[in-house]
Amino acid sequence: MKTITSSSETSHFPVMLNEVIKISSPHKGGFFVDCTFGGGGYSKSILKYPKTKLIGIDRDKSVTSNAKKLEKKFKNRFKFFQVKFSQIDKILKENADTIIFDLGLSSLQLKNLSRGFSFHSKDELDMTMGLSDFSAKEAVNNLGEIQLKSIIKILGEEKEAKIIAKNIVKARSDKKITKVVELVKIIEKSKKIKFPSKINPSTKTFQALRIFVNKEITELINGMVNATKYLKPGGKIVIITFHSIEDKIVKFFFKNFSKNKSNPSRYLPEESSDNLALFENYINKIIKPSKEEIRNNNPSRSAKLRFAVRSKNNFFYPKIFFQKFNEYLKIEAYNV
């Protein structure tokens, strides 16, 4: 969650900004890439340092006007592209010093009820972040029960996925599901909640559908690989995650393709050596927001930051990385 919204105005508080700045060291100058531009919080903070230049990327066209203002202000030091960050290799012409990913849903997207991300919305069941092939409405009305179950169970980590999927199919046989509130009612009737819960019963199903609609796992895996290809030796890739699936993927990539992997991973070829290390020694430590930041920006409470440093070794395509998480990739490839 990248921002919070006050009652009077929209304020941008990029998560763990101080930590990102400390890791990326923009005071030394260099070339940076903000792969999830959003409200521009990281980009603006980095561009304050005069010897920096930066490319901003975001799939959401709603951020374009803000990005254009930044282009005008910083001229040849900043350029914005409305593309998916998996296409970073199609944009970059030179290697970067730091590449930043702040994953997940921004509160700008969540607060805009017309986009259908919030289960408090009364609008269309959309959930598209931008440049998506289909909406959540199309997914829940067109996919089979088994496919819906897989999406909700695997991408949402929802234990009651089977009954939720069954009831979605049953409900749509009478009337097409078009509104957020309609899906919320189906989920609430399906869930076995016997006492008040801190977590809304729709949370995991909504997460699953959002991830599926925007192919977030496919984007993340391809984005990390392509970003690594365009990092300078000694360059840093910084990733902030907000749920366990994202963090598991990032951890695996950094840990298994670093020089100090403790034991040869069963996912790496037998001839694995330092020559197959894309990263320098990886410090397997999660950085979390401070208590003060969580008080000021409650959505940051679930954020986890990991970073890795690019080695001098030649880039290679890590096929086993894709194989390891093929279950997620196959689900996101369902035809709608």
Please place each PLM-identified region on the residue numbering:
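S-adenosyl-L-methionine-dependent methyltransferase catalytic core, i.e., the SAM/SAH-binding region
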Residues: 1-336
